[in-house]
């Protein structure tokens, strides 16, 4: 592992630790968050956001700070456009919150769920240890 050997991840973690100390916050647990807009299908860029955040989490731990990564899928965002390959009837639901639109294929509670499930699957396959959260969960 190269984390702990002066990578940019180590530098980011160092600056986070210093900032938290300067503002007087506890270092008992530092949360790192990665976000995904649930409008479209996750892609390499979406996964790289989660992977970079996980790298910062790991660098914090190498520097002795307990941390956790929360992957947040904002299913309260409005549906901006219907991704290619999705049913045309979804066009009548722009710009409603994704959590208020029924699942396009009947296998999830609402539109944002299958998108979030794809991100969870990608992070699991990438062996990224994170907690998952949807905006509609509060």
Predicted regions and their residues:
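N-terminal Rossmann-like or analogous alpha/beta NTP/dinucleotide-binding catalytic cores
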Residues: 1-138
């Amino acid at each position: 592992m190269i984390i702990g050997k002066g990578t940019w991840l180590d530098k980011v973690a160092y600056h986070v630790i210093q900032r938290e100390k300067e503002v007087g916050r506890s270092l008992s647990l530092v949360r790192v968050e990665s976000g995904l807009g649930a409008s479209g299908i996750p892609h390499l860029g979406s996964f790289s956001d989660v992977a970079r955040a996980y790298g910062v989490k790991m660098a914090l731990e190498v520097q002795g700070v307990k941390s956790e990564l929360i992957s947040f899928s904002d299913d309260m965002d409005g549906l901006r456009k219907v991704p290619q390959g999705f049913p045309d009837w979804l066009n009548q639901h722009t710009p409603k919150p994704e959590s208020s639109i029924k699942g396009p294929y009947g296998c999830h509670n609402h539109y944002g769920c299958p998108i979030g499930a794809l991100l969870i699957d990608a992070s699991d396959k990438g062996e990224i240890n994170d907690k998952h959260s949807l905006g509609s969960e509060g």
